[in-house]
Amino acid sequence: MGIAKLGKQIKEHKVFVIVPIVILIVVVLARTFIWRDYTKEQIEMAIYLKDKYGGQEFVVGKPVREGAMLAIEGYLVAIAYPANNSKIKFRVIHSSSARYDGYAGAVWSDEESKRLEPEIYRLFGKGTDYTVEIKSALELQNAQVNFHGKIIALDDIAKIYGKQIPYGLAIKRLKKNLSDDEKEDIVNKLIELSASLPDKTDTAVTYISETSEKREYGLAVPLDNLRKLSNRQDKINLFSEWKVGGLQDYDLRQDGFN
């Protein structure tokens, strides 16, 4: 048998061995991460929420696996909401070692959004687009509820954990090419609004005046720094551009905001 023919047979043999292995790996991964039925975990999430929040019923969506790789199990994530209020949606996380959820933050966000609405509409106009997002560090998960499964009021838990609770207010009023006078007026209104914002939490304010698929324009500033502003040029200089999705990493902790 010639060397060339032998080499060809060896290559063909390798192909016959490798291809089935690759197919097997793809099937296993697909069954694990795509086709697997997570009904059992979905039910467990609903039971976990009901037990944690004093018998309250929740609707839990279909879990999906995130953060999984060949050697990493990852975790399951589902969107849930109270059975009597589908507007308060939050994430539930389920892993082999722990379960936690964002229900408290969703409730606080909803309450704060309703509380701030009259003041925001007064300053920026009725129908102004805004969101309030409040989260809490994972170590606060058990501290968010009392012994009866009731969520502790934001003011009360902020007295204990303070800056460990991120509080974000974002206002969007689209208008291109703002003049310096308009920028100053916006900041002045935000300063007036800041009197209604909690100062014990890690509070930050965002204002968006221009947006595109990749970039946004406006300002993002911690509450304490917003309240200190008095110079006209400092107010104007707050406005800049940032990449969409990078707002949390926007320069809130630099340029004097350390």
Predicted regions and their residues:
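N-terminal Lys/Arg-rich, disordered targeting/topogenic segments
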Residues: 1-13
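Hydrophobic membrane-insertion alpha-helices, especially the h-region
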Residues: 14-33
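Short, non-transmembrane alpha-helical segments in secretory-pathway proteins
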Residues: 31-63, 116-125, 186-191
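Exposed beta-strand-loop-beta-strand "reactive/processing" segments of non-cytosolic proteins
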Residues: 57-94
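A short, surface-exposed beta-strand/turn
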Residues: 88-111
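Non-cytosolic head/periplasmic domains of membrane-anchored proteins
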Residues: 103-187
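Structural alpha-beta junctions
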Residues: 188-205
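Extracytoplasmic/luminal low-complexity segments enriched in Pro/Gly and acidic/polar residues
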Residues: 200-258
